[in-house]
Amino acid sequence: MTTTIKSLKSYKTPLRYPGGKSRACKKMEPYIPDLRDYEVYYEPFLGGGSVALHITKKYPKLKIVVNDLYEPLYNFWLQLQVNGDYVHSELQQLKSKFSDHSSARELFEDSKLKLYDIDVTGKDRAVYFYIINKCSFSGLTESSSFSPQASDANFSMRGIDKLPVYSKLIEDWYITLSLIHI
């Protein structure tokens, strides 16, 4: 990876996520144990991925196992990992094509319809999930509505163009969709 660990500070999460920890990681740092002697880090509730990304950047050799029960979220992370170039390219094209509020709202509504469509590929569903996440009021998916302000501020080329770095960061993650039994 040509991006250095120091330059990765701005890479907190590619998603907006309710209850996310992107701003809290710095404050939580003193309470996170030194993981240099550990073999695996388990993240049972991945969500926006802020903590797992923080751990990945701090301990790049540590095996990371992440999990979430929300299938569209799981699918987004998995597709970003295995089809990141496709997700990035599709989002660039869609952002260019649907750049004004009216067309962005149309894209948002269409994405909500296709998110659970069984005829849509996993990688396209990941694209739709990202659009919904970035264009909604609170980052919620199906239960939220379109926000012109969120569409302008969050569904941006700048954010889309960071996705390949996230894809590289998570390339060795083991991503699961299951109940965790302890």
Region roles according to the model:
Residues 39-106:
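SAM cofactor-binding core of SAM-dependent methyltransferases
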Residues 2-27, 31-35, 80-180:
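SAM-dependent nucleic-acid methyltransferase catalytic core
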